[in-house]
């Protein structure tokens, strides 16, 4: 499916082409402004979809971290009980209960499990930070800085970033930061560059009312897509649409200058329509990658589950570790896939 915003931009340029043969035609001038409004609303809509998806991902991340912290605290509490029970020659039921919770934690993020001689465990992140050790747990937090989500671990010297969380939470971080925020940043850049080029041509031209120096579009820097609008000086005012480069009736050089923007390369590369379609293509590639990663991890899960069921009476530590890693990969891939499919369907107008 074609990206709706790219279609709307194309329709605007087509309307300008129709106006160029009769630049004073009031009906065609109104049509150009109507198409410009369509472009603006489409940019705002896409930004809104991305913004809502980011809010949803952040909310899900915070909920899952709350549940994760409860599990981590429970592991630490059980370890305190396990240490005493093991010293007295028991503790198997407590260990089984704790291990089930460790499995849940491992689905949420990458952790290495180090078994202690006293029956307790140490849970260590991929970058070497202890979450649980010696019956003590550290708090995991979701932080947001300049729109970017990250996970941190509490410490005596302050919160420390978890570089590679992995698992379901790692998938959510990727979906938020790399996919949704990345697409929004690209969309903002394209919107701002497009408006800037169109405004340069429009402000140099004259409307049929004889005035000049007016922008066609307005936007807020850094939020170009969500704030994109037809400038108030032109909106709903066909006579204010600049078509003449000289002020003379029948001249269309200002209109032609705006039409030239269609095929001109923007600073970020490619034309405006190519750039918007590029965002669509990037989301499509992300979906394909997530599906492939999920299928690979699911295959590993099936193999390891079968192995775990068929082998008895031997140490299964390595197999269980591999199984947990496969679960993490599957969870991460599915989180990215779910979020990206929602954005792809909505932004690229499969549901509009």
Model-derived segments and spans:
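S/T-rich, low-complexity, solvent-exposed segments of bacterial secretion/appendage proteins
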Residues: 1-352
């Amino acid at each position: 499916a074609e990206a709706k915003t790219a279609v709307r931009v194309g329709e605007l340029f087509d309307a300008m082409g129709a106006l160029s043969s009769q630049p004073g035609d009031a009906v065609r001038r109104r049509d150009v402004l109507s198409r410009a409004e369509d472009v603006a609303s489409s940019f705002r809509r896409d930004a809104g979809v991305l913004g809502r998806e980011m809010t949803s991902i952040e909310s899900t991340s915070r909920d899952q971290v709350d549940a994760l912290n409860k599990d981590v605290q429970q592991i630490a509490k059980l370890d305190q009980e396990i240490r005493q029970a093991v010293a007295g020659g028991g503790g198997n039921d407590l260990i089984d209960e704790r291990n089930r919770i460790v499995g849940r934690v491992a689905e949420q993020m990458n952790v290495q499990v180090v078994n202690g001689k006293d029956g307790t465990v140490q849970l260590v992140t991929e970058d070497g930070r202890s979450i649980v050790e010696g019956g003590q747990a550290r708090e995991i937090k979701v932080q947001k800085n300049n729109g970017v989500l990250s996970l941190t671990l509490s410490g005596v010297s302050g919160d420390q970033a978890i570089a590679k969380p992995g698992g379901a939470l790692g998938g959510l971080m990727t979906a938020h930061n790399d996919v949704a925020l990345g697409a929004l940043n690209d969309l903002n850049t394209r919107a701002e560059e497009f408006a800037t080029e169109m405004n340069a041509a429009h402000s140099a031209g004259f409307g049929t009312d004889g005035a000049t120096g007016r922008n066609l579009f307005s936007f807020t820097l850094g939020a170009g897509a969500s704030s994109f609008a037809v400038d108030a000086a032109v909106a709903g005012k066909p006579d204010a649409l600049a078509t003449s480069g000289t002020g003379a009736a029948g001249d269309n050089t200002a209109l032609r200058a705006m039409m030239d923007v269609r095929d001109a390369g923007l600073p970020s590369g490619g034309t405006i329509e190519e750039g918007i379609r590029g965002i669509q293509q990037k989301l499509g590639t992300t979906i394909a990658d997530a599906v492939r990663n999920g299928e690979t991890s699911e295959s590993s899960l099936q193999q390891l589950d079968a192995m775990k069921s068929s082998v008895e009476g031997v140490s299964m530590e390595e197999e269980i570790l591999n199984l947990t890693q496969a679960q993490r990969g599957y969870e991460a891939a599915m989180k990215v896939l779910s979020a990206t499919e929602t954005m792809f369907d909505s932004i690229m107008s499969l549901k509009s």
